[in-house]
Each structure stands twice: as structure tokens, then as C-alpha cells.
């Protein structure tokens, strides 16, 4: 690839980093936000659930509304609005205002994750598309390694509001860099609701969406409450919790590497193995909580498998849909994935409040194995 291709991909990596950091940084700040606003775990967990449900509801309609817009211009609009809503989060003096700002961020998220992968594969030569997708995933991995833990460190030392302001500042920088380095990416034409039946009739797409819902719900039953789990069940210190979250995210690099090396050889087997690993890691959360080292190993494998799964499913959708429907197909994927995030956070919160936080791994594992059986029995021969 040429230098211009690399610089363009870096702009997408930066964007992925800030969007992913913003999406998940509340997970590392839940305890502080809960304490300040005097909320229960289930109530503060709604900060994650509502965000995810907004993305679920708005991904498709918003993407259809902007489907005719040139993608570079659209990306800059998204970054500008994203920055403004981060500042609003910083200024929030009530849980309601914070929730409203997060809903605004969720609206930009709804479109961002629908276009980021299609843009990545369009700005590079065809033979480098897997690398382009891996670069996008790298932004997500760095967010898990540095973004969320660093946001948590900032929150612990100078308050959770400064975490959101820091994201806003980096977002403003990313806006400027993207304006300079991302080339014009023409729209491939508008997409109307009338075309949805044809999209949904494409081979394997409905089953892929059902599978995505099951896996994402299972994953976020556990992951949404990983910070209080590590503190209350594993009795880790604040510094160890931060380290565990960094290792979780860092393992995503291995997941990205595994995807680039093995996914194209056998898509069915690759997805089967990574989902199996995710379910096993959820199952082992509580049994290994007596040992910090064992639990961190489980978190590392879990993070690796989760990243590999995410990029594999995005690649799968690009492969099984037509070029003109890819962005809308990705918007539906994003919406369904976020339905899983919201549902997982909701069910996990109910388990924390009405049973015990130590059970979240078991609940996630049960649903994860159900998803795995669905994949093997219903989708394995069709995807």
C-alpha cells in the first residue's frame, strides 16, 4: 500500500479508538457515577443499556437517511457532533443530563459503525482489505488497552467528568486529522426501505443477525459488570482492576492477528472456536476469581476471542451482502449487536441486584453455549 493509504487508515483507526473508548468507558466508571448520583447497580447500568438500545433503534433509520451523503463529509459531521456531546457529558450535573448526552453520542455511534468498515475496504486496494479491517479492529483494541483503563485512571484521580472531556479533546484532534488525510469516498447511492426485503433475503443474513444477538447478549451479561466483579468478587485493588482491563484489551491484538491469519482458511471453524472460547471464559470467571493470575489469564483469552469474533462477523457481512447494501447491512448488524449490549447489561444488572454479581459469568456462559449450538446446527452449512 502507498503512504496515503496508510495515513487514511490511521484516521479511521483514531476514529475507532475514540468511539470505542467512549462507548465502553462508563463500564470502568460505573462505581463512581453510581456513588455520586446515589444509584443502584441496575440503575447506573442503564447508562449502558439505554445507549445500546438507542443505537439498536436508530442505526437503520439514520443510515437510510444519510445513505446518499459522501462518506468523508459524513464522517466529519459525526466527529463534530461526537465532540460536542462529550463536552455535554463533562458539563452534566445530573444523571438525566448525563443520560441525554450519552443518547446524543449513541446517535453518532449509530451511523459511525455502519460506515467505518465499508470505508476501510474502499480506500485500499482489494488485496489489502483484510489488513484494512484489522486496522479498524486495532483502534478498538487500543481503546480497550489504553482508552478505557486510562479513562478509568483519569476518573479515579480527577473525577469521571474529566474522562469525557479528555475524549472530547482527542475527538477534536481526530476531526482535524481526518479532514486532512481521509480521501473523498463517494456514496454508492441511496438505500430505501423498499430494498430491505431483498437485503434480508440474501443467503445467511437473518441467521447471522440472530447469532449476533445471542452472542452479544451473552458477552455483555458478564462484561458490563466486569469492573465491580473484579473488585467485589475477586477482591482486586483499583490498580489491579485497571491492569486486568488493559490486558483484556491488549489481547485483542492477538484476536486481530488470529483473524488475519486463520479466518479466510475456514470461516465456520474460526467463528466456532472463538465463540466457544468466549463461553468457556464466561463460565470460568467465578471459579478462577480466587486467583488473580488465573483470572487475568481468563480475561486475556476472553478479550482475544471477543475481538476475533467481532471482526469476523463484520467481514462475514461484507462477504455475504452486495456492495450497495453493505452499509445498511452493517447498520442492522450494529443495531442488533447493541440490542445484545443493552440486553446483556440489563440482565446482568438484574442478576447483580436480585441474585449475586458472582453469577453473571454463569448466566453469560449458558447463553453463549446456546449461541454456539445455534451456529453449529442452523448456520454452519450456510455461512
Located regions from the model:
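Helix-breaking motifs and short loop linkers at transmembrane-helix boundaries and internal kinks
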Residues: 38, 70, 91-97, 108, ...
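Conserved MFS/SLC helix-loop-helix module at the cytosolic interface between two early adjacent transmembrane helices
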Residues: 57-93
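Paired small-residue
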Residues: 81-88, 96-104, 293-301
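Cytoplasmic helix-loop-helix junction between adjacent transmembrane helices
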Residues: 101-139
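Intracellular juxtamembrane helix-capping segments at the cytosolic ends
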Residues: 111-124, 308-322
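A late C-terminal transmembrane helix in Major Facilitator Superfamily
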Residues: 319-357, 364
Amino acid at each position: 500500500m502507498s503512504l496515503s493509504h496508510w495515513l487514511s487508515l490511521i484516521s479511521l483507526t483514531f476514529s475507532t479508538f475514540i468511539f470505542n473508548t467512549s462507548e465502553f468507558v462508563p463500564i470502568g466508571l460505573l462505581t463512581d457515577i453510581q456513588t455520586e448520583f446515589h444509584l443502584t447497580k441496575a440503575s447506573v447500568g442503564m447508562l449502558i443499556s439505554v445507549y445500546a438500545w438507542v443505537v439498536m433503534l436508530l442505526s437503520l433509520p439514520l443510515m437510510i437517511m444519510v445513505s446518499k451523503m459522501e462518506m468523508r463529509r459524513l464522517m466529519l459531521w459525526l466527529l463534530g457532533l461526537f465532540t460536542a456531546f462529550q463536552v455535554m457529558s463533562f458539563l452534566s450535573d445530573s444523571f438525566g443530563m448525563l443520560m441525554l448526552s450519552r443518547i446524543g453520542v449513541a446517535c453518532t455511534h449509530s451511523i459511525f459503525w455502519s460506515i467505518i468498515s465499508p470505508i476501510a475496504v474502499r480506500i485500499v486496494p482489494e488485496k489489502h482489505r483484510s489488513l484494512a479491517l484489522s486496522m479498524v479492529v486495532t483502534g478498538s483494541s487500543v481503546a480497550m488497552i489504553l482508552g478505557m483503563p486510562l479513562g478509568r485512571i483519569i476518573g479515579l484521580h480527577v473525577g469521571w467528568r474529566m474522562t469525557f472531556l479528555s475524549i472530547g479533546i482527542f475527538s477534536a484532534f481526530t476531526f482535524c486529522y481526518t479532514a486532512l488525510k481521509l480521501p473523498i469516498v463517494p456514496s454508492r447511492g441511496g438505500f430505501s426501505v423498499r430494498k430491505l426485503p431483498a437485503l434480508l433475503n440474501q443467503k445467511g443474513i437473518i441467521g447471522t443477525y440472530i447469532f449476533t444477538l445471542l452472542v452479544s447478549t451473552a458477552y455483555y451479561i458478564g462484561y458490563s459488570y466486569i469492573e465491580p466483579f473484579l473488585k467485589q468478587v475477586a477482591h482486586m485493588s483499583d490498580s489491579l482492576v485497571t491492569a486486568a482491563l488493559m490486558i483484556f484489551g491488549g489481547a485483542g491484538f492477538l484476536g486481530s492477528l488470529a483473524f488475519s491469519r486463520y479466518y479466510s482458511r475456514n470461516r465456520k471453524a474460526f467463528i466456532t472456536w472463538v465463540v466457544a472460547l468466549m463461553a468457556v471464559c464466561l463460565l470460568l470467571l467465578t471459579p478462577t476469581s480466587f486467583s488473580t493470575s488465573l483470572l487475568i489469564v481468563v480475561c486475556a483469552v476472553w478479550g482475544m476471542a471477543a475481538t476475533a469474533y467481532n471482526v469476523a462477523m463484520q467481514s462475514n457481512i461484507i462477504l455475504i451482502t452486495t456492495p450497495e447494501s453493505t452499509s445498511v447491512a452493517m447498520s442492522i448488524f450494529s443495531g442488533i449487536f447493541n440490542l445484545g449490549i443493552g440486553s446483556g447489561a440489563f440482565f446482568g444488572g438484574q442478576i447483580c441486584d436480585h441474585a449475586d454479581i458472582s453469577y453473571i459469568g454463569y448466566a453469560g456462559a449458558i447463553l453463549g453455549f446456546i449461541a454456539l449450538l445455534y451456529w453449529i446446527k442452523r448456520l454452519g452449512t450456510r455461512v
